[in-house]
C-alpha cells in the first residue's frame, strides 16, 4: 500500500496501530513491548550443484545432498560461534529440495532459509557468512561450480514500537481492560511488515493478543509440550475470547488516541 502511494493519495495518519495473535498468552490478554519488538527477516535461497549419478556408485558423483547437509550444519556455527550472543540471530533452513527417487543422486539441491536479525550490521555479517560457508563447503566437496546464493538487498525491517506511544496505550489498556490483562512482553525473533509504517515516519505500535485457552496454556507449561503456534496447521485460536479481547483493545486504544486533552 505504501509503495502504491497510500500517503500521497490519502492524508498521512497521526498513528499506526496493529494487533497480532499470540500463542504464549491466554486468550484476550494484551501484550506490548516498547522499542524494538520484532526482528528483521530475510528469505535466502542456496542452490548447490553436484554431479549426479547412480546411488550404487557414489564414488563417480559429487553428491549435492551430502553437500547440502554439510551446509545446514555449518550454518549453525554462525549463530553459536560467530555472533555475539547479545545480538540475536536465527538461521533456519525450512526447506530442502533435491532428487526425484532414492536410487539416483541428483545434480543439484535447493535450500530455502529464513534469517532473523535486529541490526543492519549483524544482518550484513550473517548474510556474508552464509555466502562464505556455502562457497567453502562446495569447494571442499569438489563441486563442479560455485553455489548460487540469493538474498534480498533489503528484507523486512524490524518493528519499532514508539516508546512514548506504547506507554500511553499501555496505560489506557490497563485502565480499560485491567492490570492483569495487559502485560509487557519480551522481544521476539518473528517479523512483520507493519514495520514499514514506522519507517515512513508514522508513530506506530504493534500489540499482541493472546489466543490460547488458559487451561490449555497452563497444561502446556506444566508438561513442557508447547501449544501449536501460528504458521502451524494445527494453530486454532480461541475465537470468541480472542476476538472480544482484540476488539476491546482496539476500541480502547482508539478512544485514547482520539481523546482531546
Indicate where each model-derived feature is located.
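Metal-dependent amide/peptide-bond hydrolase catalytic core
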Residues: 69-261
Amino acid at each position: 500500500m505504501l509503495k502504491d502511494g497510500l500517503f500521497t493519495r490519502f492524508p498521512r495518519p497521526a498513528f499506526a496501530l496493529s494487533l497480532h495473535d499470540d500463542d504464549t498468552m491466554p486468550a484476550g490478554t494484551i501484550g506490548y513491548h516498547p522499542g524494538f519488538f520484532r526482528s528483521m527477516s530475510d528469505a535466502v535461497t542456496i542452490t548447490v550443484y553436484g554431479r549426479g549419478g547412480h546411488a550404487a556408485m557414489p564414488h563417480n558423483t559429487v553428491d549435492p545432498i551430502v553437500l547440502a547437509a554439510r551446509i545446514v550444519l555449518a550454518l549453525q556455527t554462525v549463530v553459536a560461534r560467530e555472533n555475539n550472543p547479545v545480538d540475536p540471530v536465527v538461521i533456519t533452513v525450512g526447506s530442502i529440495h533435491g532428487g526425484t527417487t532414492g536410487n539416483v543422486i541428483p545434480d543439484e539441491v535447493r535450500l530455502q532459509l529464513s534469517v532473523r536479525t535486529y541490526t543492519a550490521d549483524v544482518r550484513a555479517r550473517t548474510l556474508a557468512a552464509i555466502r562464505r560457508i556455502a562457497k567453502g563447503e562446495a569447494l571442499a566437496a569438489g563441486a563442479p561450480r560455485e553455489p548460487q546464493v540469493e538474498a534480498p538487498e533489503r528484507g523486512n525491517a524490524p518493528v519499532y514500537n514508539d516508546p512514548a506511544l506504547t506507554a500511553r496505550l499501555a496505560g489506557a489498556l490497563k485502565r480499560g481492560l485491567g492490570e492483569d490483562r495487559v502485560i509487557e512482553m519480551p522481544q521476539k525473533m518473528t517479523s512483520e511488515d507493519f514495520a514499514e509504517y514506522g519507517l515512513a515516519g508514522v508513530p506506530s505500535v504493534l500489540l499482541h493478543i493472546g489466543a490460547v485457552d488458559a487451561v490449555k496454556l497452563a497444561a502446556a507449561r506444566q508438561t513442557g509440550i508447547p501449544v501449536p503456534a501460528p504458521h502451524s496447521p494445527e494453530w486454532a485460536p480461541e475465537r470468541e475470547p480472542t476476538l472480544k479481547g482484540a476488539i476491546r483493545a482496539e476500541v480502547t486504544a482508539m478512544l485514547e488516541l482520539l481523546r482531546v486533552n
